Amino acid sequence: VSLESLENATYFPALVSQSTGYYEGQETPGLEHRMDFDYDVHGNQILERDYGNGNPEDVLTTTTSYHNLDDQHIYSVPEEILLTDDNGWLRRRTVSVDDAGNITETRDYLSQDSVAVNTYAFDKYGNLIEAIRPENLHGDRLSFTYQWDADLHTYLQEVRDSYGNHSAYEYDPRFGELTLRSDMN
């Protein structure tokens, strides 16, 4: 590798391994905990392997893949996070995004047949305008709507949930300072 080819490259200090020894008053550690990490070309962590106490049955591996939104230069939003051990997967989350890179849905797999779905909607300014939580025991989904100021599209004005509860906010736009908050409490 020549220095010319490295001149315009991007670098970051990547933690590739971490080891912690627990000495408990002894000269040698009675317990050691090690973790290894790996990264993609954008510096996103794609692998975390936790060796626990050194027992092969305790090893947990988290693998993460990311959305690649080249036009927006967004590479850090996870697409899937998978936690596995010796017996298979323990946790799984998938993430959907819109063309702007906003997260529109997360799916948390509680088992192969059970999925908890959160959905999100955004306005053209990238502000969150609706969040809907997973179904409860009765199939109901708690939702929240968010209203933003009409002038700057920066300041949250109101949050309302599907039960009819709401909170209202007022700001001093000169300083971005919250001046009033009112809710049912």
What are these language model-derived features?
Residues 1-185:
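Non-catalytic interaction/targeting regions
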